[in-house]
């Protein structure tokens, strides 16, 4: 899935000039965890390459950062700028980042806000200071996603198998054109059925979700999906949601489409406030 997360502020977290004055390492933040008691850090994902093992840092009572020390030789501004041109490197970093975030979402009683890739501060103290300054913003996010998981639904139209109109010596021009029209009408009818199935899926699953967001189609996608949506689903409704998704998948097959359900994920698409999908 496409990675998203919380960014504490809009400008770069560490400027190039600041990095030049810093020695050795910086603090990389994976996520923020809210829980009544400190989570236990047991064996889990090792995190980014060249980084220290993920650790917890206290922000305030009931709130922790999951962070690591990263070498500026690998994660300084210039290094990251070069790395962003290498899609394989970005993919490896994203997978490692998400593995740490997802490990903490599995901790009982924890609510987790994933951070954007490359959320880096000069040190732990500076990171804590920034998070405390955003406490009101973070509190709103925690209230929105608490007790929920993100599930994704993607619906794509299947290719309609139609015989290619053949122009033969015995066939009249009008018969050939009529055959082409029947093929066009069949494709149009299927498209309309798929759109109706996608709309009904969005409504049915949306009724079980706390919030729904449409996701931006991937740039590399050759066939844009008819529906690509994320659903913020309360844990208590998870079984009902999955059952409804199974019924929707069957409806989509009948309409000539395929529904793919993914999840559960951390609430990547619900970190920022926004209107639910219509």
Question: Each PLM stretch: what is its role?
Answer:
Residues 1-21:
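N-terminal amphipathic/basic-hydrophobic helices that include classical n-h-c signal peptides
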């Amino acid at each position: 899935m496409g990675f998203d997360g919380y960014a504490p502020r809009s400008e770069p977290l560490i400027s190039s000039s600041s990095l030049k004055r810093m020695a050795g390492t910086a603090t990389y933040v994976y996520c923020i965890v809210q829980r009544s008691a400190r989570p236990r850090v047991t064996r889990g994902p090792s995190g980014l390459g060249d980084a220290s093992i993920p650790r917890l840092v206290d922000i305030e009572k009931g709130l922790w950062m999951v962070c690591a020390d990263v070498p500026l030789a690998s994660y300084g501004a210039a290094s990251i700028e070069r790395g962003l041109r290498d899609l394989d490197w970005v993919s490896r970093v994203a997978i490692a980042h998400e593995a740490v975030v997802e490990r903490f979402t599995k901790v009982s009683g924890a609510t987790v806000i994933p951070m954007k890739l490359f959320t880096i501060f000069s040190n732990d103290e500076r990171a804590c200071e920034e998070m405390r300054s955003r406490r009101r913003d973070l509190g709103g996010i925690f209230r929105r996603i608490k007790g929920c998981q993100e599930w994704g639904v993607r619906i794509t139209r299947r290719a309609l198998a139609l015989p290619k109109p053949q122009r033969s010596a015995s066939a009249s021009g009008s018969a050939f054109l009529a055959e082409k029209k029947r093929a066009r009408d069949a494709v149009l009818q299927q498209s309309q059925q798929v759109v109706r199935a996608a709309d009904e899926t969005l409504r049915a699953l949306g009724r079980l979700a706390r919030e729904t967001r449409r996701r931006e189609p991937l740039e590399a996608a050759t066939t844009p999906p008819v529906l690509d949506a994320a659903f913020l689903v309360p844990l208590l409704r998870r079984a009902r949601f999955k059952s409804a998704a199974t019924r929707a998948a069957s409806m989509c097959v009948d309409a000539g489409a395929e529904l793919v359900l993914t999840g559960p994920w951390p609430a990547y698409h619900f970190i920022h406030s926004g209107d639910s999908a219509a």
